[in-house]
From Swiss-Prot:
Description of how the protein assembles with itself and partners: Homodimer.
Gene encoding the protein: bioB
UniProt cofactor(s): [4Fe-4S] cluster; [2Fe-2S] cluster
Identification of the protein by name: Biotin synthase
EC number: 2.8.1.6
Binding site for [2Fe-2S] cluster: C96, C127, C187, R259
Amino acid sequence: MIRNNWTLEETLELFGLPFNDLLFKAHMVHREYFRHNEVQVCALANIKAGGCPENCCYCSQSAHNKTGLTKKGLSSVEEVRTAARRAKDVGVHRFCFAAAWRNLHDRDVDRICEFVKAIKEEGLESCASLGMLKLEQAQKLKEAGLDFYNHNVDTSRAYYHNIVTTRTYDERLDTINNVQEAGINVCCGGILGMGESTEDRAQMLLTLANLKQHPRSVPINRLVAFKGTPLEGAKKVNSVDFVRTIAVARIMMPASYVRLAAGRSDMTEEMHALCFFAGANSIFYGEQLLTTENATPEFDQNLLSRLGVVATPSGAHESCAC
C-alpha cells in the first residue's frame, strides 16, 4: 500500500528489524510492485563541470573545495546527442544530464530544452539535474518533453546544516514541489556515509515518503570521499547499513525505482545482490558518473548475467504480482 503518512517511530522500527526479516519484508513488497529480476539502466553525463558556488561538503565540483577539478563550459546540443546515442547503443534506457551550478538560469533554458529534445529523438527517457528550478522553468522543460528532474535532499533536515549552508532544505523542497506541479516525474534521494546517524537516514526517507507524491526514482548514493573536500576522511558506510537503507526505502516507497547511484565502484557482487534482493531496481551504467568512478560496463554485464537479472525500460518492470 502506498502511504504518505509515515511516522518516525514506524521508520525506526523498520531500521531496527533483524536484517533477514527486513530483507524478506522488502523483497515481498518489491515483488508486489515490480518484476523482481529486472533493473532499469541509466546513464549520466556532465554538461557543465566545476565552479559551482554551493558549498556542499561532499562535492568535487564546488568552488569552495580544492579538488583540482578542471572546469568545463556548457555542452553543445550535438555533444549531448552524441552521448545519448552512445548510451543507447550499449543498452541504456534513460539518459540523465547534470550541470554544476546553483540554479538553472533563464538564459540557458532554451539550450536545455534542446538537450531534452535531442535525447527524446534518440528514443530515450530524459532526466535533468540542474539545481534549483522555478515553476515557469519547470513548465518549459515539461513542454520540451523532459521526463524526470533530479534534485536530492541529501540527508535529514536536522543534519543538513553540517553538509550545506548555501542552500536551505526548504529551497530543495520548493524545487521538488515546482517539478511536481509542472507534471515532471521527481527523482530525489540522498547520500549515505557523511557522518549521519540511523535516525538521520530514517528522517531523510520519511521526508521523501511523505511528499504529496512519492519520487518516481529514489537514488541512494554511497559517499565518494574526494580529496580536497571536507569529507575526504569520512568513514565508509557499513555495507549492512547501506542495504538496510535500500530495504526501508523499498518498503516506504513501494512503487518507486530505488537506484544504486554513486559509490558502486567498490561494491562487491555479493553486496549488489543483497541490494537487488532488498528492492534496488535501477543502476547507472558507464565507467564515469559526473566526476566519480562507476562500476565498469563489463562488471555490470557479468553481474547481471550471473544473477539472472535483465535490463529493461521503465514501465516494463511494473505491476507484477509474482
